[in-house]
Amino acid sequence: MAKKSMIEREKKRQKLVNKYAVKRKELKEQIKTSVSFEERFKLQLELQKLPRNSSPTRLHNRCSVTGRPKGYYRDFGLSRHVLREMAHECLLPGVTKSSW
């Protein structure tokens, strides 16, 4: 189980990303379409003034049960350990153990 502070920190980052997503997208579009160097530079400075944690690059996928950051399965939102346990207990519909 991950530390609660790390899980909360990741939730806080997700809120910031959602809050500033529209503004960040608009600024990036303006930077792409601007012609003059001065205007582009001014827009770039404005983009840099946004909070650092509002960038989607700083997000890290975590297991929704344990908060584990590694071995994350995007389709389920779970780490490999929890996925295996839940699959064995038939808690994930449509997931079967493979055999050939």
From Swiss-Prot:
Alphabetical keyword list: Chloroplast, Plastid, Ribonucleoprotein, Ribosomal protein, RNA-binding, rRNA-binding
GO biological process, one term: translation
GO CC field: chloroplast; small ribosomal subunit
Gene3D superfamilies found in the cross-reference section: 1.10.287.1480
Intracellular or extracellular location(s): Plastid, Chloroplast
Molecular-function annotations in GO: rRNA binding; structural constituent of ribosome
InterPro entries in alphabetical order: Ribosomal_uS14, Ribosomal_uS14_bac/plastid, Ribosomal_uS14_CS
PROSITE patterns listed in its UniProt record: RIBOSOMAL_S14
Role of this protein: Binds 16S rRNA, required for the assembly of 30S particles.
Subunit note: Part of the 30S ribosomal subunit.
Family according to the record: Belongs to the universal ribosomal protein uS14 family.
NCBIfam families cross-referenced by the UniProt entry: PRK08881.1
Name of this protein: Small ribosomal subunit protein uS14c
Annotated source species: Mesostigma viride
